[in-house]
Design a protein with these regions (language model features):
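Active-site clefts of carbohydrate-active enzymes
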Residues: 1-17
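Loop/helix patches that line or flank the sugar-binding groove of alpha-linked glycan CAZymes
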Residues: 17-95
Length: 95
């Protein structure tokens, strides 16, 4: 249902503010299918795509929003690295 080249499910199906509900429905469908489910980082948490300003974009194909680091803690608690790093991440973390 998703991979590193597609917007995260919570963003892709959020046309009317129902992204979280639809992401849960997609998760239920995915786990009900036969075989091994594969999920990409952030999908298991229902994270939406990160909002990356054009001047901070790294990928010319525009795939940075779904490749941003997963925040381990809120930036308000852990600082600008959100518990992910004490350095500067390659891509900015979403609030």
């Amino acid at each position: 249902m998703a991979n590193h080249d597609l917007p995260r499910v919570a963003s892709r199906f959020n046309t009317d503010g129902q992204g979280a509900t639809r992401a849960r429905a997609v998760g239920v469908m995915l786990y009900a299918l036969r075989g091994t489910p594969f999920i990409y980082q952030g999908e298991e948490l229902g994270l939406p795509d990160a909002k990356i300003p054009p001047e901070q974009a790294v990928d010319v194909d525009g795939r940075d929003p779904q490749r941003a680091p997963i925040p381990w803690q809120p930036p308000s608690v852990a600082g600008p690295g959100a518990g992910f790093t004490t350095g500067t991440p390659w891509l900015p973390l979403d609030e």
